[in-house]
UniProtKB/Swiss-Prot annotation:
Chemical reaction(s) catalysed: a plastoquinone + NADH + (n+1) H(+)(in) = a plastoquinol + NAD(+) + n H(+)(out); a plastoquinone + NADPH + (n+1) H(+)(in) = a plastoquinol + NADP(+) + n H(+)(out)
Cross-referenced InterPro entries: NADH_UbQ/plastoQ_OxRdtase_su6, Nuo/plastoQ_OxRdtase_6_NuoJ
Cross-referenced PANTHER family: NADH-UBIQUINONE OXIDOREDUCTASE CHAIN 6 (PTHR33269:SF17)
GO molecular function, one term: quinone binding
Keywords from the UniProt entry: Chloroplast, Membrane, NAD, NADP, Plastid, Plastoquinone, Quinone, Thylakoid, Translocase, Transmembrane, Transmembrane helix, Transport
Family: Belongs to the complex I subunit 6 family.
The protein's name in its UniProt record: NAD(P)H-quinone oxidoreductase subunit 6, chloroplastic
Organism: Mesostigma viride (Green alga)
Gene3D superfamilies, per the entry: NADH-ubiquinone/plastoquinone oxidoreductase chain 6, subunit NuoJ
Length: 189
């Protein structure tokens, strides 16, 4: 094994560890803002894996589209709609945790069996000539409708988050004006 192969294997191992730790942080951290930042880190690690697989265009698209656009929209939505609520633990919380653990473990076993039962191809012939134009043609011809649906869905999500945040701000401003003037609150009659 040459030195460059060792460096490539070490880089792949570090990116895989970063992806797994970041994904666990996204799921397990109680602060949703930190989860959003870790999601960006996971997406950057995945782009690094694409770079190691000699798919530079996919890596650049991963960073531009997912990290640069979608993760920023998610973080804006989190910051605009971040409500601090006290969650009351329910009586059947233990049953919910057990059921969700069972479902996650079942999916893990199912995916593990699928991975080990799949016949993987050792080498894949990748044609780099005109690959970017082929991807662009597929996106804007065969996959135009899903592409537009996703863009409209992201736009509606962002507009909805702004609308919800502004609606809450208006009610808070109205309540603060009433308390400033020492007037009785009309909602408490």
């Amino acid at each position: 094994m040459s030195f460059s192969e060792q460096i490539q294997n070490l880089s792949l191992l570090l990116l895989e560890i970063g992806t797994i730790i970041g994904a666990l942080g996204v799921v397990l951290l109680p602060n949703i803002l930190y989860s959003g930042f870790l999601l960006g880190g996971v997406l950057i690690c995945i782009a690094g894996i694409y770079l190691l697989l000699n798919a530079e265009f996919i890596a650049a698209a991963q960073v531009l589209i997912y990290v640069g656009a979608i993760n920023v929209i998610i973080l804006f939505a989190i910051m605009l709609v971040n409500k601090i609520e006290n969650l009351n633990p329910s009586n059947n919380q233990m049953m919910r945790n057990g059921l969700s653990s069972f479902i996650c473990f079942s999916f893990f076993i199912l995916l593990s069996n699928m991975i080990f039962d799949t016949q993987w191809i050792d080498t894949v012939g990748v044609s780099t000539k005109y690959s970017i134009s082929i991807i662009g043609n597929h996106i804007f011809s065969d996959f135009l409708l899903p592409f537009e649906i996703v863009s409209v869905l992201l736009l509606v999500t962002l507009v909805g988050a702004v609308f919800i945040a502004r609606k809450e701000d208006a009610s808070e401003i109205e309540i603060s004006k009433i308390s400033f003037l020492n007037l009785p609150d009309p909602s408490k009659k």
